[in-house]
Amino acid sequence: MNDYTYNNIESSRREYDALTPSEWRKDYFNDDNGGFVATHVLKGKDALKREGIAKEVSSCLVLANNGKRILRPKGYPDAYFDGQTWDFKTSTFKNEDSLRHAIKDGMKADNIIFIVNSIELEIEMIKKAIKSEIGRRKKDEAWMELPDVYVLVQGEIKALWNKKKAESFCL
């Protein structure tokens, strides 16, 4: 049995239905768990110009199918759910430096989700980049400013690193 009760799904449906069409495009609602995706009408115009938008949108659908209530606001961040801001990164990075840059870019959000394909290789590269960025920020405790890092692997979001566990990796 799942954790999705009738009341939770109905509450989610009311939240989704309350979004005004002049501000939000209602992209998807999952009747089985109450997960949904809604995109700000202005984000749709800007986002079409960005690379990786298809992966970002499909990732939001995966998360909604896992019961997440996803709002995609105009501008930054890429998404808002679970009371936090999220930045999506496609894992087409060639080296550790490009991954570190992606992590620094994602610092505007509470969390980063790397959308990965080849699980072990890419996760190891992301871990190296995180370790490197922690090392660069360690002396002045600035590493605490780093966002928590997750990976989206085969339809599941998994924690990779978070501040509470500091120097240990979740995967």
What do the PLM-derived regions correspond to, one by one?
Residues 1-70, 91-171:
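Metal-dependent nuclease catalytic core centered on acidic motifs
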Residues 74-77:
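Acidic (E/D-rich), amphipathic helical modules within compact regulatory domains
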Residues 79, 84-92:
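Conserved catalytic cores of phosphodiester-cleaving nucleases, focusing on short active-site segments
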